[in-house]
């Protein structure tokens, strides 16, 4: 959530930075709310000061020998009670205004970092670097065809069980999924991340804290009878691990890694990626999450991105790193690096990880702070996929396919999978 002080003190900056995202906003109503709230605060403070003065005067009169039940004291006490009632009314009005202001602020995305390149959409993203030698060869199959041939998954039975955009993995496919999850968790915990296995169901406060609500409610699955949602990413429960907490400064940075199933409606993706593992309603992902001191956010962003890249390098998968422009940033992100893995069958790069620094945006929504000397301040948060399992499997199938129909796997996976290749069953 954006800082309310921006609305009151620098609305021009807020409007200008949102315009970098391609958003034209009218802040007049927001400014009016913020000013009303400030006026009420000043009225309440003035009344409370007057109430304190009256209370002290009562004490002084009694100390000087006045009758506690006398008319002078009674009149002052009556005056004090009237002030308390007025203060209570103002506090109630303040709460209502604060709630309305917060409701409006929750709909605004994060402001882009000054370092984030300006641009309109994904066409303006900037390639930062690449790694590996992409396999460019005619006649290679896409991953869904390879998976069908090897008997790794069944989409038709999944439609019978659930609906479209679900898959059921069998045999080597299920084993490879499990191997990838364990490999990624071991790689990240070996670098000092603390492993977390969070709830798959999360409440509305958690989704609001990470930035999914209220904007993306229609893209998530909600339980009919409870205030619970299927999590779209482990970023949601990881953000709320420290909601409403003050993290001791000497504990920062906190680095977590979590495997979780993820659930998304994929609204607006009709007709795209209808086959295979690229765009599903349910998929598995290993997520990286950092809580850091604000002064260390930039170096943490480089580090979390490098940790996601390390998975691709260990799996010998060619990829490139793109810095997203302002027009392509996610809702909660201030700056993002996307990792795109090469799919040899499709002959294209596809996103497999987004590594974002969110500044204090999520921390303000979730009230996550640290104590810096005598000052309490919001922490900064970062997140990144490390990695999406299904898309990693798709890349392994397409890049490792062999002329005899088998799929050669990278050596790093052999201890987890038990073999260096997938064979037709």
UniProtKB/Swiss-Prot annotation:
Entry-linked InterPro entries: aa-tRNA-synt_IIb (IPR002314), aa-tRNA-synth_II (IPR006195), aa-tRNA-synth_II/BPL/LPL (IPR045864), Ser-tRNA-ligase_type_1 (IPR002317), Ser-tRNA-synth_1_N (IPR015866), SerRS_1_N_sf (IPR042103), SerRS_core (IPR033729), tRNA-bd_arm (IPR010978)
Known function: Catalyzes the attachment of serine to tRNA(Ser). Is also able to aminoacylate tRNA(Sec) with serine, to form the misacylated tRNA L-seryl-tRNA(Sec), which will be further converted into selenocysteinyl-tRNA(Sec).
Protein name (Swiss-Prot/TrEMBL): Serine--tRNA ligase
Quaternary structure, from the entry: Homodimer. The tRNA molecule binds across the dimer.
Binding site for ATP: 264-266, 351-354
Gene it is expressed from: serS
Functional pathway: Aminoacyl-tRNA biosynthesis; selenocysteinyl-tRNA(Sec) biosynthesis; L-seryl-tRNA(Sec) from L-serine and tRNA(Sec): step 1/1
Species lineage: Bacteria, Bacillati, Cyanobacteriota, Cyanophyceae, Synechococcales
One Pfam family, short name: tRNA-synt_2b
Annotated source species: Synechococcus sp. (strain WH7803)
